[in-house]
Amino acid sequence: MDDGYWIVRCVNSGVFFTRGIERTNLTEAVLKWSRMVHGWEGAAALSQVCVDGIKGGRVCVPVLGRIVVDVCEILPCREAAVENLLNQPEWVV
């Protein structure tokens, strides 16, 4: 896959906003740069998140290099969603 921005949904690992995906098999992927999207408001489903972004929620700090082994959905992000998600504050405790 290319180095564009994507939303990756995993069965148990959660949801990730990522740039650059390397698929290793049907359900495993290496995310080159990613932020976990722990929760969101302002979008009914991930298909809306990848188009519009979110209005509120919890987006974790960026991680360089992450392997997920339970991928079930990969959605390309539109430019508006990319700008929105890149500018979400980092959720930390």
Please identify what each model-predicted range represents.
Residues 2-93:
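Conserved RNA-binding domains used in RNP assembly and mRNA/RNA metabolism
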